[in-house]
């Protein structure tokens, strides 16, 4: 275990809390220099430039990060946004949005996410390929300017971003996590896209369910394109989702008012910049499903879905709204539908492609090493349970009962 610890000197900056200064990355990473920023405003021009001209996901939009900082970052947490530049030319190569927070009497460096970013990926300056060597050199530069911490814990690292290798996934300490994400490419005519890209069994079930919904008073995909519709349809999403999760005995982030406010405000902002879209699927006068999406260039990210499973018997509203949104997305010019993180069976049923997410979880100090090892052991335990269906069912039922007992009445 001790061999995994990194020297604290590599993490110490000697800066005041709001000071930002460039640091050489050391002999091992002479190709890059890094600069620590402790406010969003300090990096706003560069962030917006990389967002529009570089490579990133919809989870790395500046406005998304701004909402996280304004409403979700814990009071005792510090922003640690690192700008990495080419040492020879001075040109920016990437922006790495991190934060430092207190966790059980030690400090941890995490992604600037607070639970509302499915993916952890730097904003890259361009599509220039990264190698393991260049990624390690850039990461050494990042570490050289971060504030003192006991461990690194970054989850949800996709292997690629926009077809470019994610530098974080190339690092030696990066390991496959127990989580995966799914996506499906969309091309050709919108009217036939579902039939062409999805599995025949999914298409058959989808068409059958759509006919049943249509017989229930007519079928309509409603976009929340006004402030009133955003409030109404998003409110329905929260209501249906919390009801469903209570029924399943599961916890949902939307049980926290600040998280609800974050998503609602992002949806209102999306009316102007198109970064967020909300759709409801209505059968007659009944809203049977709601989908919350983020949009970036040609990609639609499915972030939140809520369904009323009992509204129409023997129908899967979730599959129906997914099918309708694939058609809508292709018609609107999108070429990739990201089904986000989670191993739900409907994703494979559709024909989406699975990709395993990586994570960085390692200690810098002995205290951090101990905490990181505990997290890894817990992850192995979860993976073991998931790989044993009977054991998983028992564990799931136990957790559902436990959460119901703890839920307010």
Where are these regions (language model features)?
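Acyl-donor binding region in acyl/amide transferases
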Residues: 79, 101-177, 295-355, 362
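Low-complexity, flexible helical/coil segments
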Residues: 69-72, 117-122, 130-135, 187-194, ...
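Short linear elements at protein peripheries
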Residues: 397-409
